[in-house]
């Protein structure tokens, strides 16, 4: 809890966050942080939450909840379960969006949230009102910043340069000026710095 934020019901809010974290801690794929393996989707949710609160210390209850469940249990529908084509990728992403929203809705209902709040969280997860809604822009900035800070180096190491540059340009195009300012402060490796420069220079 940060800024002057007060959840509508602190017990319900904390219960929902705890349940999201419990689910994501079941991720069998881990990532080492300071030499300690952490469940990947749990880690992703913590990083996304951190960026949302850094960008918007007074973030709304629905935005905080959405940040914590954006990729809820993503490992349950692996990429390999769809054809390894562009169409297969888009189909996989569309299925995942609905899957995350449904699972998040189940947990929010279990926590005692009303359908109206559940709908607002799911709309953020599904990017339904992006970019019109300010909260959706904060979440998108946070998603892009997690990518730039924690995933860019891995992508650059296994992807053709033009595809990485394209991914960077797409991310940059979705970000607000505030998000871009934070992105330029990140500590990039030499290769990633050069790729970002290339992407921004078009």
Give the label of every model feature segment.
Residues 3-18, 22, 35-42, 46, ...:
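Divalent metal-dependent phosphate-bond-processing catalytic cores, especially two-metal-ion Mg2+/Mn2+ enzymes
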Residues 23-30, 34, 75:
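Acidic catalytic motifs of isoprenoid enzymes
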Residues 32-36, 87-93, 133-134:
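A ubiquitous short alpha-helical element
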Residues 61-80, 100, 104, 123-129, ...:
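His-Asp-centered metal-binding catalytic motifs of divalent-metal-dependent phosphohydrolases/nucleases
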Residues 72-86, 148-154:
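Acidic, Mg2+-coordinating active-site segments of isoprenoid diphosphate-utilizing enzymes
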Residues 80-123:
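Helix-adjacent hinge/juxtasegments
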């Amino acid at each position: 809890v940060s800024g002057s934020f007060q959840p509508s019901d602190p017990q319900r809010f904390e219960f929902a966050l705890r349940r999201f974290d419990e689910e994501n801690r079941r991720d069998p794929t881990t990532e080492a942080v300071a030499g300690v393996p952490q469940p990947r989707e749990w880690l992703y949710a913590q990083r996304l939450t951190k960026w949302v609160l850094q960008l918007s210390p007074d973030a709304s209850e629905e935005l905080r909840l959405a940040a914590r469940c954006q990729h809820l249990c993503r490992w349950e529908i692996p990429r390999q379960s769809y054809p390894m084509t562009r169409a297969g990728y888009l189909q996989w992403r569309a299925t995942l969006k609905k899957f995350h929203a449904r699972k998040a809705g189940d947990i929010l209902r279990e926590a005692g949230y009303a359908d109206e709040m559940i709908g607002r969280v799911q709309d953020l997860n599904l990017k339904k009102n992006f970019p019109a809604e300010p909260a959706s822009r904060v979440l998108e900035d946070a998603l892009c910043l997690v990518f730039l800070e924690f995933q860019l180096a891995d992508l650059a190491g296994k992807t053709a340069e033009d595809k990485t540059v394209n991914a960077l340009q797409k991310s940059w195009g979705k970000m607000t000026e505030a998000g871009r300012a934070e992105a330029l402060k990140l500590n990039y490796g030499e290769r990633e710095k050069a790729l970002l420069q290339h992407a921004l220079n078009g």
